[in-house]
A protein has these predicted regions:
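Ubiquitin-like/PB1-type beta-grasp interaction modules and other compact soluble beta-rich domains
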Residues: 1-63
Length: 64
């Protein structure tokens, strides 16, 4: 699969939530697009990933 343009192996049955935690992201502070579709946060724990998926993860940061 690709995450933000970088190739990455994905374990069988991996979810969006598991991947975000593995990458060190706070699921409450990111937006995730899978194959061109925004995934609602409420679905992160159920949304399964495959080797063919393309993910874009956008992190929100505070500041002024």
């Amino acid at each position: 699969m690709k995450v933000n343009g970088n190739e990455r192996a994905v374990p069988v049955e991996e979810t969006v939530l598991a991947l975000l935690k593995e990458l060190g992201h706070d699921p409450q502070r990111v937006a995730v697009e899978k194959n061109g579709t925004i995934i609602p946060r409420a679905q992160f724990a159920e949304e399964k990933l495959t080797d063919a998926d393309h993910l874009e993860v956008v992190c929100f940061v505070g500041g002024g």
